[in-house]
Design a protein with these regions (language model features):
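Glycine-centered tight turns that cap/initiate beta-strands
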Residues: 100-106, 176, 226, 408
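Mid-to-C-terminal secondary-structure elements
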Residues: 134-148, 158-258
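Peri-transmembrane interface segments
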Residues: 244-247, 258-292
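Short cytosolic juxtamembrane segments of multi-pass membrane proteins
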Residues: 2-4, 400-415
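Transmembrane alpha-helical interface segments in multi-pass membrane proteins
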Residues: 5-16, 20-31, 35, 286-362, ...
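Hydrophobic, regular-secondary-structure patches
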Residues: 44-127, 170, 218-219, 242
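Alpha-helical membrane-interface segments at transmembrane helix boundaries
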Residues: 9-17, 43-47, 51, 272-288, ...
Length: 415
């Protein structure tokens, strides 16, 4: 044991004699490891945030979304605002037919658009969520002031509106908004509620949105009878897959679709959505981590070159140590330990920097109202350190072997 510690001490002393080279190498490794930690933390944090939102729906929910045949549904606020797709085939009558299926318990449909909201002299562009009144049974729609609109108000096409927290502050400041009238497309809406602040989710600023009944949006603003999607909950969760297939068959029949590739809708259970999100985020995190890992491997080649130059520069030292009794394996271990110590120190420093940067990203996201999770797992820290030390071992083997091969007589003669 003492022999091992003496070898480590000797390796440290040798590295301290080359402070500039040691510091630069440690910093280079630290930057790579820090990048790896930040990427893994950001990926895990974002995945946790999205999954926590999806879990609010429960495992008994089926989602139906419109899409262009052969393509995926719209997934972000930027796509929505650019009008990437407008499918008009999913009608109110389709939703009613789905609701009539024997295993469907509750449901709501939705349509989303952009409008200018006005109150006295204030005006602002907002995302308008035409949501069914039953949406409160599915989503985390928490009311801070007032209430959410009722099913009766939706059925009567009542001009009622629920404001996001930021919109309420913009239009009314500290004044009470409940009962006040705001305008969308010159149609007056009575404010019945104000949402609690939720931050941003998947590109949507949830606090800069307003909610009105689906039918109200269709009839009073858009003059349409189609929706963008719907969610249904089932009575018997054991039959959820069967109900999903019934919905698919029903919509294909109503839309006259024979080829599944021509589906203008997508039906997924919430469990499938959660699994898909996990796969997508895990894949993105893995790909980015591989890119960083490649850069670290390139850094390992640099360490090999540095250590090889060090062997050449320290030929006399190696020869002298061999002459006074050091064995080949002693020389090999010294140079190998130097490479391992370099990468281990770089790994530890990188982990510390990575955790600090990840926490700063978390604080920055929170300050901008983005719903974000700070998540640095023990697994990612251990993996980063193991990868860092592995690079040191691999990078140090060749120069260490070359150092062990040095002939002591030739080394002393050259000096």
């Amino acid at each position: 044991m003492n022999n091992i510690f003496s070898k480590i001490e000797l390796a440290f002393i040798s590295l301290m004699h080359q402070k500039s080279r040691t510091i630069l190498t440690v910093i280079a490794i630290a930057i790579g490891i820090a990048s790896l930690i930040v990427i893994m933390s950001a990926g895990d944090g974002l995945k946790s945030t999205v999954l926590s939102e999806l879990e609010a729906y429960g495992s008994d929910v089926i989602s139906i979304e419109t899409k262009i045949p052969g393509k995926r549904p719209v997934e972000s606020a930027s796509e929505m605002s650019l009008g990437v797709t407008t499918i008009t085939t999913f009608k109110n009558s389709d939703v009613d037919a789905i609701a009539a299926l024997p295993n469907v318990e509750n449901y709501y449909s939705y349509i989303i658009g952009q409008e200018i909201i006005k109150y006295e002299g204030n005006a602002k562009g907002v995302m308008v969520f035409g949501y069914g009144a039953n949406s409160v049974l599915f989503e985390k729609l928490k009311i801070k002031e007032g209430r959410f609109y009722s099913l009766e108000e939706e059925e009567s096409i009542a001009p009622v509106i629920v404001l996001g927290g930021s919109i309420k502050e913009f239009l009314f400041g500290d004044n009470d908004a409940i009962g006040q009238k705001v305008k969308l497309r010159n149609v007056s809406f009575r404010v019945v509620g104000v949402m609690e602040k939720r931050g941003a989710i998947s590109g949507f600023d949830m606090d800069s949105m307003v909610y009105i009944p689906t039918l109200t949006m269709q009839k009073r603003l858009l003059d349409t009878d189609y929706v963008m999607g719907a969610s249904v909950s089932v009575k018997d969760i054991d039959k959820i897959d069967q109900t999903k297939e019934e919905i698919i068959e029903l919509l294909r029949e109503r839309h006259n679709i024979d080829d599944p590739d021509e589906d203008d809708f997508e039906v997924m259970t919430m469990v499938e959505v959660q699994n898909m999100v996990e796969v997508v985020f895990s894949t993105i995190t893995l790909l980015l981590s591989i890119i960083v890992a490649v850069s670290l491997i390139v850094g390992g080649v640099g360490i090999t070159n540095i250590m090889y130059v060090s062997v050449i520069e320290r030929t006399f030292e190696i020869g002298l140590r061999r002459a006074i009794g050091a064995k080949r394996r002693d020389i090999l271990w010294q140079f190998l330990l130097e490479a391992i110590i370099l990468t281990f120190l770089g790994g530890v420093l990188g982990v510390i920097i990575g955790i600090a940067v990840s926490y700063l990203v978390y604080l920055l996201a929170i300050s901008f109202g983005i719903n974000w999770s700070f998540n640095v797992s023990i697994f990612s820290v251990i993996m980063a350190l193991v990868f860092s030390v592995s690079i040191g071992i691999i990078a140090g083997v060749y120069p260490a072997k070359e150092a062990a091969k040095v002939d002591p007589i030739e080394a002393l003669r050259k000096e």
